[in-house]
Amino acid sequence: MVKVMVVAEVRPSEDVNKVLSAISNFFDFEKMNTRKEGIIDILVLEARTLKSLLKFHRVLRNERILDSARKYLMKGIEGNTIAFMIHKQAAAVGVLSFVDSDKESPLGAIKFYIEYQNPKEIVDWLAPKTAHGVPLWDNPVPPDV
């Protein structure tokens, strides 16, 4: 079973539609929930298919950041989950920039969680190893089982 979840804070100075637009540059969600934590709204977006990450897959290649993406994705594997964060302001202008901590994105990072039976298979699809910047393989989207 596949579950892709994206979590982002919407602070009082931010427009929820702009945060949704930033996320939508990389992720096609099926379901959205919002909860309140003090004065901050928390967006929780979900999808049950890896095809929801096709934009993310394409951007990794267009921006030529497969090697750094692979490093962040591999580092984020724990059990059957991959967790990583991207810079919210960069995402708002369509640029993918990974961050190590929430503090690196002043308005909070966008957090991705991908649950899958074999997380390494997802990493190999999204960000394959490269030689001189060229992917060594181009795997199809793993099946949503």
Swiss-Prot record:
TM ranges: none
Lineage: superkingdom: Archaea
Pfam families named among the record's database cross-references: RNA_binding
InterPro entries reported in the protein's UniProt record: PAB1135-like, Ribosomal_uL5_dom_sf
Family from the record: Belongs to the UPF0201 family.
HAMAP family the UniProt entry points to: UPF0201 (MF_01112)
Name the UniProt record assigns to this protein: UPF0201 protein SSO1042
UniProt organism field: Saccharolobus solfataricus (strain ATCC 35092 / DSM 1617 / JCM 11322 / P2) (Sulfolobus solfataricus)
